[in-house]
Amino acid sequence: MPRRYLLDFEKPLVELEKQIEQIRELARDSEVDVSQQLLQLETLATRRREEIFRSLTPAQKIQVARHPQRPSTLDFIQMFCDDWIELHGDRNGGDDMALIGGLGSVNNQPVLLLGHQKGRDTKENVVRNFGMAKPGGYRKALRLMQHADRFSLPILTFIDTPGAYAGLSAEEQGQGEAIARNLREMFGFKVPIIATIIGEGGSGGALGIGVADRLLMFEHSVYTVASPEACASILWRDAAKASEAATALKITGKDLLELGVIDEVLSEPAGGNNWAPIEAGNTLKGAIEKHLNELLELKKEELLEQRYSKFRVLGKFVESNNFEEIQEQLPQITE
């Protein structure tokens, strides 16, 4: 079993983890029955972990979302797809490894699955470009989504990126155009689209595969227009104020659900998805099946209209000192 990587605010659990590991080693090396002591320590560790994660700040949630052992797109796909076949290439000479896609089935329903893919270590992260897709990645995603639309396959996307790659080469290859084209085309696909933020949902890199009929988000994932570090540097010329920026940006599932940006917050195991990835996979699969069944009942025209309306209402607001007037206008704003 790989050693668990503990975040700064999890340090109170370090001593408990050491004791649990020592007892496990004792059980392996001798015939002494330590099951009762092990159960007590594991129960105590779980309780303390729940207490810590119940009161995370937005800045701490970012650390959880970026956890190196957090389940990735491929992890989730392999958990609930036995027939996954990855498809490659943007048909323009490239095959971006930071954004993957392919065919599979969920509960016997054929689907297209695609998402950002980070690495587990430095070497793999270099290959995956730390989950930051280049223009070719978004063009590959568009090609696969067009394929899904042509063959009436629902589209499932998994978002986990700090943002689209912002290097000079990406700009030269048309990063903005590639993302903008995806946004435009996704509004016109006549198949259900479900997007899930499984880790970081950063800026245009997330939006490039995020135009969906249902947008789901794990409890400790984040969704933001810019990283808190970048926001703090821009607004206050001080990256050290990232914690304040994280709070102001409203990046958590709770905030975004209240603002109407996302449709559902998926609960995570105590300690985050990295502590119990199988449980997290079952939660995600159940949510996808529920929303997919609802969307498959809709006619194509209804699907397109609801998708358009969902995004059209974002950002609408009214200005008035008259509270009753605002209440009267709210139904019109949300229509």
From Swiss-Prot:
Which segments constitute the CoA carboxyltransferase C-terminal domain? Answer: 40-294
Q: Give the EC class as a word.
A: transferase
What InterPro entries does its record include? Acetyl_CoA_COase_a_su, ClpP/crotonase-like_dom_sf, COA_CT_C
Q: Does the keyword Cytoplasm apply?
A: yes
Q: Which UniProt keywords apply?
A: ATP-binding, Cytoplasm, Fatty acid biosynthesis, Fatty acid metabolism, Lipid biosynthesis, Lipid metabolism, Nucleotide-binding, Transferase
Q: Which terms under GO biological process does the entry name? A: fatty acid biosynthetic process; malonyl-CoA biosynthetic process
| Subcellular location per the Swiss-Prot or TrEMBL entry | Cytoplasm
Q: Which PANTHER family does the UniProt record give?
A: ACETYL-COENZYME A CARBOXYLASE CARBOXYL TRANSFERASE SUBUNIT ALPHA, ACETYL-COENZYME A CARBOXYLASE CARBOXYL TRANSFERASE SUBUNIT ALPHA, CHLOROPLASTIC
Q: State what this protein does.
A: Component of the acetyl coenzyme A carboxylase (ACC) complex. First, biotin carboxylase catalyzes the carboxylation of biotin on its carrier protein (BCCP) and then the CO(2) group is transferred by the carboxyltransferase to acetyl-CoA to form malonyl-CoA.
Q: What is this protein called?
A: Acetyl-coenzyme A carboxylase carboxyl transferase subunit alpha
Organism, per UniProt?
Answer: Prochlorococcus marinus subsp. pastoris (strain CCMP1986 / NIES-2087 / MED4)
Phylogenetic lineage = Bacteria, Bacillati, Cyanobacteriota, Cyanophyceae, Synechococcales
Q: Which gene encodes it?
A: accA
